[in-house]
Design a protein with these regions (language model features):
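Acidic/aromatic-lined carbohydrate-recognition and catalytic surfaces
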Residues: 1-134
């Protein structure tokens, strides 16, 4: 398997790109900063990048609210595709850290539970939720 033979360079993109901790929804094309680092990453001998969470989240990236969208603090899906294309052109593979065992409070299905409570079709997605005030 290729991963066993690879040298990985890990990037926590929200920190690496200087994004604010709280997601205020303001679009910034920060992920493009990675393009400037490709020569350095290659010089280190890395042939794979491990990106910590890149999906839309409320704060630190591990509380995802949209798995189909790059965090607006980092840019657009097109920005990220450009970065991945440039990495691939230089022979660097891309691995994403997907956090799929939990979501953030901003996740659409959880928002539906907050709004519709027990009548939400997604209430069972979230284990034991107490609606009695506790």
């Amino acid at each position: 398997m290729w991963a066993y033979e690879s040298v990985f360079y890990q990037i926590y993109p929200l920190g690496f790109c200087g994004a604010p901790f709280e997601n205020d929804g303001v679009l910034e094309h920060r992920i493009l900063k990675v393009n400037d680092w490709i020569p350095h990453i290659k010089k280190l001998g890395a042939d794979a990048i491990y990106f910590s969470p890149v999906f839309e989240s409320d704060t630190h990236g591990y509380n995802t609210r949209d798995y189909t969208k790059i965090d607006t603090r980092l840019g657009t899906n097109e920005d990220f595709a450009q970065v991945c294309d440039n990495l691939h052109k230089d022979g660097i593979k891309v691995v994403l850290d997907g956090v799929f065992n939990h979501v953030g409070r901003g996740f659409w299905a959880f928002q539906d539970v907050l709004k519709n409570r027990e009548s939400s079709p997604y209430v069972n997605w979230f284990g034991r939720i107490a609606f009695d005030g506790n």
